[in-house]
UniProtKB/Swiss-Prot annotation:
This is Potassium-transporting ATPase potassium-binding subunit. Belongs to the KdpA family. Part of the high-affinity ATP-driven potassium transport (or Kdp) system, which catalyzes the hydrolysis of ATP coupled with the electrogenic transport of potassium into the cytoplasm. This subunit binds the periplasmic potassium ions and delivers the ions to the membrane domain of KdpB through an intramembrane tunnel. The chain crosses the membrane at residues 4-24, 67-87, 135-155, 179-199, 258-278, 286-306, 376-396, 420-440, 487-507, 528-548. The system is composed of three essential subunits: KdpA, KdpB and KdpC. It is found in: Cell inner membrane. GO terms for molecular function: P-type potassium transmembrane transporter activity; potassium ion binding. The gene is kdpA. NCBIfam families: kdpA. It is a multi-pass membrane protein. It comes from Pseudomonas aeruginosa (strain ATCC 15692 / DSM 22644 / CIP 104116 / JCM 14847 / LMG 12228 / 1C / PRS 101 / PAO1).
Amino acid sequence: MNSHEILLILAFFALVLVPAPFLGRYCFKVMEGQRNLLSAPLAPLERVCYRLFGVDPASEQDWKTYTLALLAFNLAGLVLLFSILMLQGSLPLNPQHLPGLEWTLAFNTAVSFVTNTNWQAYSGEASLSYFSQMVGLTVQNFVSAAVGLCVLVALARGISRRSTRQLGNFWVDLTRGTLYVLLPLCLLLALLLVWQGVPQTFFDYVHATTLQGAEQTIPLGPAASQIAIKQLGTNGGGFFGVNSTHPFENPSAWSNLFEVASIILIPAALVFTFGHYVKDLRQSRAILGCMLLLFCLGLGLSLWAEYQPNPALAQLPIEQGAPMEGKESRFGTAASMLWAITTTAASNGSVNAMHDSLSPLGGMLPLLNMMLGEVIFGGVGAGLYGMLLFVLIAVFLAGLMVGRTPEYLGKKLEAKEVRLLVFTLLVMPVGVLVLGAIAASLPGPASAVTNPGPHGFSQLLYAYTSGSANNGSAFAGFGANTPFHNLMIGLAMLIGRFGYILPILAIAGSLAAKKASPVGPNSFPTHGPLFVSLLTVTILLVGGLTFLPTLALGPIAEQLSLGF
């Protein structure tokens, strides 16, 4: 690594960690309806939204009502987006006269964006009109991120409140998260991207003649606005087919830095938001420390793996540097691996290099990030509520080891909460191992892999892991656009999203109804280095050990076949 690459990584951490505490406090004020920096310009618009949709901002909901409102909203969004994609050919802002999508692809895409996954079995510039990109996908990018924020806030209230059945109002939380948090940040990032050269236009595609005399079509469109929310909302779906490797999505080193840092900006800030809810920022620092430890470990190992020469070519009389296949030469290895680890540590899925071309170990680390449940920062809201599940599991295990009733911040964890926690541990294995095994065992679906041997298995494993983890990145050699995979990966995305949300809201409701006992000297501290170590080990063992056999059949076997 040279000095420029080291400076890039340091700048990345600075852009994320310096504003995170301030943004976290701002998010707390917003979600609790306190006066904040943008109250003056946005509060009147917020009140208009409530009047327009008949919402009483003073009323609150219990966990069941909150859950029903969330499910109804997501179902309506799914039906609306599916209809837009099917009827695309008859809708406006379609200068290329693109037809509607085939129904299984439309279903897969609608589920993908509603669940904040943004798995793309299509190429945006060749398949979707401007209307579908803006009114369909971009809207869901905003609201799916806001839904994740709502679930996190409900869980934080459940942990911090006492002897109540109320978790807040879903419609109020959704409005505030979108209006005060996502829209202002996306406006700022979109302007920065336009400054760097990302297109934001309704003009038709440009037809040009190259120097060799060949005809070329240059796609345009309102890209900057969608790219801003796809990064900040941890959505990840690209306006163009090759995502942020495309020079129109990511034209410069500055745009690359802005985009990769924005992936985990809000997830990092929400760690501090949680600290404000429980009135103990030490909890935030402990959770953030665990996240950073796992993140830096993955980044360091991936950089080491990608800077190694290919062992299969070691006997040849050639000088090898870091392999550059699948990487943008304008960014290089360090920027590519920083993005790969960041996009899979969060549930983002955007890419600035092709993960299918990484070394076996370099490709395994993004895969492992997803298998851990996207808790290393994770998605907007989704990452922290996933991490809090592991916090509760770690507290439960600590209670078993010392023979005490486990409790977290004064709230006792009883049989009901533990059963729900165990249920969430089964979500990823069902999506990855069960659905993936069905796909691998049938000859038709298995033909979607384009490589023989362990790497072909890794392609299929990555696809179903990405869908179940609501990430959306891919080993792009996998032929995903078939009716079977469209439906099965769509099912995996639904399981991965709502299989977590439903038990989390139930846990939040149960904890909110409990009384909190004062934290005393006999309580297990959840803010020191000992707990950070216990939490890290819990994530690696409980979250990662489940998938070790599948990793052995895929990337580990591929690495051993090349020579270590």
